[in-house]
Amino acid sequence: MTNDQPFRVLGVSGSLREQSRSVIALRILLDFAAQRGAQTRLLDLREVDLPLYRPDRESHSQYEQRISADMDWADAVVLASPDYHGSMSGAVKNFLDYVWEECSGKLFGYICSSHEKGLTVMEQMRTAVRQCYGWSLPYGVSTDGRVDFDAGGKLKNERVELRLKMMARDLVVYGPLLRRQFLSDFRSAESETFAAIYRKQVRAEE
């Protein structure tokens, strides 16, 4: 990112269900981020037919190219997943397997649709992102589709709405600080930084 361009927030929807409550919450968050001047984009994994990740496969489909381009575009990312037996959806995990390099030095937020608060789901997403050199907000947003939305799918829980607004604000405020410093560290010769560890690994794989 540069000082003269808007901050860019990518929302990644990891539910393959139509009218998913997690993606509804994600859209609301992206709207709040846009109100704060961010450029936003939604990557709906329902529309991306990603094969299971195979590190030894050399060919890259148009869908793989799309998710890589979207992640390259993003300065910050919000992952939204349903709670599947206490874990993130397979779609989200498969997505992260593809994009570890593109996660580096970016701030992440997490949304989970769950009737049990989704704490283990968000912690698993946070752990995976940390291993991909990403940074995470210290909280997430949990929604319960049974009580937080009306019959038409509209969010009715004001506390959840306020939490989504808070996350949008924090992404737009803290995200640029982190992104600019990480890019500066990555381009420098300084060796005692988190970015230097990532830089060393990237160059080892070139």
Report the location of each language-model feature.
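N-terminal beta1-alpha1 ligand-phosphate binding loop
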Residues: T2-G37
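Glycine-rich phosphate/pyrophosphate-binding loop and the adjoining helix
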Residues: N3-Q5, L137-E206
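A generic structural motif
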Residues: R36-R41, G134-S136
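N-terminal beta-loop-helix "entrance" segment that forms/cooperates
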Residues: L45-Q62, A151-G152
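Helix-loop-strand module that forms the ligand-binding subsite of alpha/beta enzymes
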Residues: R57, Q62-W135
